[in-house]
Structures are given as C-alpha cells and as structure tokens.
Amino acid sequence: MPDVRIRPVSAALGLGLIAASASAQDQVHGTRSERLYERSHDVRATLHHGWAELRVRRRVENEGPRHDQAMIWISTPAGAAAVGLKTLGTLAGQPRWFSGELMEAEAAAARYRELTGIGGYYPKDPALLSWRSEGQLLLQVFPVAPNGDKTIEYTLLVPTRYKDGAHRYDLERLGTESLPATLSVAPPGRGDRLLVNGKPSAGGALGATGKTTELALVPKSSEPLGGELAVAATGTRHVTRFSIEAAPEVSRVPRGAQVVVVIDASRSLSDEQVDAQKAAAAAYLSHFRDAAVEVVTFGRKAQRRYGTWVAVDRARRDLVATHIERKNGSAVDEALLEAEGILAAAPAGRPRRLVLTTDAIVRSRLKPERIRAAVGQSGAVVHLGILAGDGPALTRNDDHLWAPAARTTGGLVWRAGASADAGARKQMVAVYEEWARPLRVDHVKLYSPDLEVGAIGEVPQVLDEGQGYEHLLFTQRDVSWVRVEGELWSKRVERVLHPDAAAGKRWAALAFGSSLLGELSEPEMMKLALAGAAVSPVTSYLAIEPGVRPSTEGLEHGTVGFGSGFGSGAPSLRMGATSTLGRAPPLDREKWLKDALGTSFAACGGKAGTATISLETTFAEVVDVARVTLPAPRDPVLERCVSEAAWDLVLPPQFDAEWTTWAVEL
C-alpha cells in the first residue's frame, strides 16, 4: 500500500477530531471568543441517476467585540466529496457570491494565512475549506465582523445506490448538536419520480433533519438494461467504476394480446393438479386487461373450450367454475399444433401468447423434435409449464429437453408450482406475472477487453427488475467499454457502456470518499483531485472576496487554534495543510502549455509547427485567450476548436504568478 502520511496537528486539534468523529456532528467555534454562533444551516439535495448533490449554506453571527474567525468542523455524509466553495460578500454595494479556487493544500493554507494576517496592504476576506481526515473537513472563515454575520456555501457529492427500482441515499442528520440542518429537496427531472421516506414527493422544504431521511429517485426508463461507466486517470493507473441496472420495469404486459391457454387434462394428473393448472391460468390471465382468450384442454386430443375468442374476464371466471374431465393420452404436440393453428388464423397485428401446463408424462415416441415442429407457426411466444410442487413458484428450466423448442419462440420451459387454495390467490397472481411479462434479466454477463480476468468481481447471474450491481476498482488500462448482456425470457438483451466524461470527473472526486482512498499515492491524489475539483488530503478550496475589515484586525499568528484559542498556550494550527507535498515541484510552465495545447491542436486537426496561441493567466487561471494565429487561408473551425481547448485547461498550482502573458507555438 502506498505510504500516505498526514502531518501531525496540535493537541487541541487532535481532541477536536476525536470529539467530532465520536459524535458524527459538526462543531462551530470562534477563534477569539465564545460568542460566535451558527444561526442557520440549510441543505438543498438534488438527486440524479447514480449520485446526489448537497448544496450546503451556513450563516454564522459574531456577538463578540472584535472581528473573529469561524471554525466549522464538518462531519461529511457517507461517501461524500466536497467539490465547491463560495462566500457571500458585496461588490459595488450589491450582494455577490465569490467562488473558491481549488489549490494545492500547502499553498492554499499559506495564502489564507497571508490574507488573514495584520498588514498595511488592502485587506482580503477569505474562506478556506480543507481536508482534516476521512469523513471530516474544516471550514475557516475570516473575518466575521462584530455584530455582523457571514454566509458561506459548499457543495458535496454523494454516491447513491440503485435498489428496488430507485437511486437511493439515506441522508443522516446533519448539523451541530444544537442546530440541525434544515433540508429541502429539488423537484425530480422530467419523467422521474421522487420519494421521500418512501412516499411520493414533488420536492420542497422538509424541515430540520432530526433523523435519517430516505431519499429516492425512480428513473423513467424505456430500456431494460442501463448503467454507467466512469474512468478517471491517476497518472499510473485508472479509477474505474461501472454500474448495471435493471429498469424498474424491464417489460410490460402487451395490450390487446391474443392468448391461448392449454391445460393438460390427462389421467396422470390428480384432481388437485388439474385445479392447480386452472388456478395458474387464471392468475396468469389476471395481468391482461383487454386480451382475447381461448382455452384448450387435451388428453389424447385437443379440445377447444369456446370455439371463438372471449374476453379475458369471462375466461377467468369460467376457469374457476368449470369442471375439466380427465381423459387418456397426453398429446402435448397435438395440443400445441391446435393452439398454434388458432393463433395463426386470428387477425394479424396483435401480440400472441401461448401457455401450456402439463406434468410432462408423455409417450416415449414424443421426441423433442416433435415439440419443436409443433411451435412457431403463429409467431406466438410459447411458455411450457411443467408441474412441480404444491406451492406457488416459477423457475425457468433451461436444461429441459423441450427448452430449445420454447426458446425459438422467445419463451421458456418452467418448473411450475401452483395452488388452488383461496389463501394462496394473492401469491399466485404475483408469481404468475412472470408468464405475462419478464420480471428479471437472466444469465447476466459482463465483458470488456480492457479488464483483467477476475477484475469484474462476482457479477450476479440474475438481476431482478429494479436491482443493480456496481463495482469500483483500479485498472491498469483505460477501459474503453463494458458490454452487459443477458436474457429477458429467452430474448437476448445487451447494453454497451462507454466512458462518460461527467461520470469520470464525478468519480475522480468521489474516490476520496471511497474504499480506494487508502491505496492512493499523493501524486495520484493530486491528479484525481484536480480532475474532480475536489477537496482532498492534497488540495483545498480558497474563496476570496474584497475586504471590508480594518487592516489592523487581522489574525495574530498563534491565535488560529481550535475553539477560542487565544491565551491557551496551545500550539498553533497550520490551516488547511494536511498535504505532505510541501512546495509544489518545479515545473516548466511554458513547456506544460505547449504540450497540453499541442495535444489539443492535433486533436482539432492542426499540423504541428503551424500555429501560435496567445493567452493570459493569473495564477492558475486562464483569464484570456487573445488570439489563435494560423497560416492562410483562415480556418474558423480550427481556430474555435483550439481556442476552446485553451479555455478548458486546468492549470497546475505551479502557475503561481499574479499575471503572465504567453505566446505558445503549436
């Protein structure tokens, strides 16, 4: 395992970490006095497919006599990553949010210390969000003026789990012991449904989070299989996360179907078995609302019950009331031929279904080939139910000799347990829905040419509708695609997952809330943190607004400890510095720009050595792309492509000059 060392902190800070970890609650303190209080803590949750965003807004108030620093120890929700920071200030007399910049942790801490100190320069008012330990962040805000307040906002991402047809997250109580957070939930996206504590919701305010809140998003889905592939490079390997999801409903009962139910009436069956077949047929038909039905019974010969199509409700009533006389013979093949003929003669254009139940005790000359020859004429999906057991149960039997015949139609052979008892009726209806429509994806397999043997893990062979599987791992190769395949009844379905850029960025951040954290080296952490814009052991957010405090009201060195701090004699806290990188290593910045933009230029279709791009940076930010110079004739499409690539650059922390112009030859 890579050696991940965290700098030691003061004794007071260590006690604070222990207390916060044990209580799993936030703590809010002032540095100079005990009269700094948190007045509001609002959380806005937005659920997405596979993740949720928590936008957290907090306001602190200072009733002390001097400008003070707010120290907010944040116990993050399970799996969370912090990906943004803003502080509310004023500009030209108007309220304005000032967004934070993600920086190397040491550099952010040094900059915060510089900005909060006493000096004769024009003051700036910063907020620093830094990593303290897994599951805990520290938010430092200075200054909070006497009798004034300060509002800050940070953004957390959390992974959801897909279960029972919904993307779910159980949000535990947030806030301090005395002030629980107030929760609101954004309305769901178009077509999706939101559940709060198991009940439908349109979103809105939910009030204080006094206990765990169960949030769920039921996705609108037209495909039986879904999922996501996320890949984030660490420099030496990749964080790879894939998920597969069976839709909340992988299929639907067809409307206007033509259905023939075939019941074995041979004498090898008991009266109870005949009644069980009738109960199974009635339970199956209960899922059709507007089907046309014919019933066929068979011994040596097949016999139609009606000689015409009847409404599904009538067929169900008659099945319960009609006595079926048992006869010699078990001509399954003749019964199938009769049913196929009925369906083939029916008007075209409607879904067709054929269900036959039997004990499969048949003549020896009835070979599987005859069953195969008896089906397929009408195009109906054929299910063959072999009676087995007394209680309601259905299990596919792909090893049965008749299975190949049924599979050619899209249907299956089943072990069918049934009961005519009134007490079993509800369970019968639930079980026999699987003949009306597929309820699960069977024979699930995953494949990718970029995954090592055994890397995928124990993939479930069956995914019931509404259930999923996910896996997070390191891979040596950049996974280009993952194919998921399975069967609905006997129909093959598949989904090919390609890397999603947004998901890759998201999981670059969420890796810091995952089980992979302890295996990351510091260079890998930096790579992922910059890609995911996340607070990490090596990165922090620093938000700066124009200052309003007197320059004499800065923080004295040694007074930035935990709690009230001053006069305690406790060691000072190195703010926001949990990185062991120290100073960022030297970097040829012009070469970095040339390499990064050269790659983009080539991807845009440019020829090396033919272009120059002029841009300006302020610290690690591209503030202007002045022009792109290309040889004649002018190519506006190429110019635009290269310009957009420059605007998309993520500069490393070694770009630390206040203002620089660059002319980069590509």
Model-identified regions with their sequence ranges:
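VWA/integrin I-like adhesion module and closely mimicked acidic/polar interface patches used
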Residues: 360-408, 414-417, 422-430
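Von Willebrand factor
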Residues: 253-309, 315-357, 362, 384, 388-398, ...
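Charge-biased low-complexity segments
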Residues: 556-666
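N-terminal, polar/Ser/Thr-rich
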Residues: 17, 22-50
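Extracytoplasmic/secreted cell-surface and envelope-processing proteins
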Residues: 162-164, 269-272, 302-307, 332, ...
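Asparagine-centered strand-capping/turn motif at beta-strand->loop junctions
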Residues: 60-66, 74-76
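An acidic, Ser/Thr-enriched
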Residues: 73, 84-132, 136, 140-262, ...
